């Protein structure tokens, strides 16, 4: 038997919080403000954590031309400045070279008017009963417990190690998760079960 779980909201609380900022060319306060405003239209948990960390009312009149690219990030004009906020691949596609954080968490990279402006590191908390759930699966005869996540490899591996998961797949977009599930289904022996939680 194989159980595959999505990380956010299943194994973790889905309540992200800012753990660290590395601002480049701008102040940390300006970095957080621009990120929160650029993400102001999004309901994604990461966007919510940025708005929460900003802690002020969001003036949507300051934000124009918002374009959200699912699984990658957002582009917006904030106070006339072109802001990109998203994962490393999103900024690389824009011709920038984002830094790779060494700390565990999900990095929201920022660019302002085509210049890299650093990253904001966001982390989630493992649910208190997640380890018990994994143990219960094992006791029920599940041979493989795997996790899919859009998070960075370091964040995914930290959760996988803590919960003693057999397989961890990071940097997954929604389409990647579907492909992983199809691959798991294809390699199942006859009579075996695949469950996605």
Name what the model sees in each region.
Residues 1-197:
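Cytosolic catalytic headpiece
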């Amino acid at each position: 038997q194989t159980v595959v779980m999505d990380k956010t909201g299943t194994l973790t609380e889905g309540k992200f919080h800012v753990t660290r900022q590395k601002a480049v060319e701008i102040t940390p306060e300006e970095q957080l403000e621009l990120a929160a405003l650029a993400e102001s239209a999004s309901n994604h948990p990461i966007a919510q954590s940025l708005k929460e960390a900003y802690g002020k009312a969001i003036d949507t009149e300051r934000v124009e031309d918002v374009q959200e690219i699912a699984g990658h990030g957002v582009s917006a004009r904030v106070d006339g400045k072109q802001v990109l906020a998203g994962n490393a691949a999103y900024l690389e596609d824009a011709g920038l070279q984002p830094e790779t954080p060494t700390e565990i968490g999900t990095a929201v990279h920022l660019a302002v008017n085509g210049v890299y402006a650093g990253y904001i590191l966001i982390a989630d908390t493992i649910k208190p009963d997640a380890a018990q759930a994994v143990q219960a699966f094992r006791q029920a005869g599940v041979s493989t417990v795997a996790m899919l996540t859009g998070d960075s490899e370091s964040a995914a591996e930290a959760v996988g190690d803590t919960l003693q998961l057999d397989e961890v797949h990071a940097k997954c977009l929604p389409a990647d998760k579907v492909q992983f599930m199809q691959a798991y289904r294809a390699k199942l022996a006859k009579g075996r079960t695949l469950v996605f939680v």
